[in-house]
Amino acid sequence: MQDNFQVKNAEAQQVITDECVIAQKIYGKCRQQDCLKPVDANTIPNPAMIQIDSSRLGETYSISNDAILVGGPITPNSIIAFNSTVSGVQLVPNTFKIQDLKVVNVQPNSFGQNGFYDVTIKYTFAYELNLLDINGATLPVTLNSPTPAQITNISAYTTYTKLISLFGGEAADSTVVTANTLYDPQLTFNEGNIPYALVNGIANPLTVRIGTYVVGATTEYHADVTIGLFTIIKLYRIVSMLVASGGNCEVPTCDPIQPGDPCDYFNSLPFPFDEFDPPTTLI
């Protein structure tokens, strides 16, 4: 049976030629490792952390529970504030994710550095929270939907906006009009000849705890999630580029698994030792 995942070129020798291709050429790139942390009355900021807000309500409707929530019903997008009846907070397992990653804009550098661009990126981290009593039991709240219901898993989110400056190529600030039949609509307008941005992100919750906040004469408590964020940012332009090529890729005929022989296919797979004993480079 052919392995469709290992396509090999039958040609032992290839003739290398120069070919012109349309490519996404990277002009500037960087990586950042950010520790995002809410700062409450008991936290001393330090250079290793970036301040973010406490958890906000991500439900479509407000939530209420006069026994624990501060200030009446908590409306969507408001900070989830509660009193000292809540003794702990926890994330619902497997609910944390980057819900939205958006390049807000790419603009010429505000300090006038030629070829550099300011990139504004907004992250939205979504997750579900449990509020816990002194015994570790979940405290319910009422979701004020058209059919009100008690819930213990509360949808919440945190946002973070990053601003970085990257080289994006020196170009005149003309408007570039492009017609491409690959897309619909065909016509696009790039005002100012701005480079394109590509952003990749990986985030994980590091800790979740109760933060103490003094609002006026009132002390209230919030769910504070510390987040570790890895980001790679690239600025690129679509260009014509001359590259060395060995010709077109070979595409062999697919050899599908025949009905009735799943065991033959399974038995041909290598044993996944690394899944049982993950390798390590530590000595």
Give names to the regions the model predicted.
Residues 1-283:
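Viral structural modules
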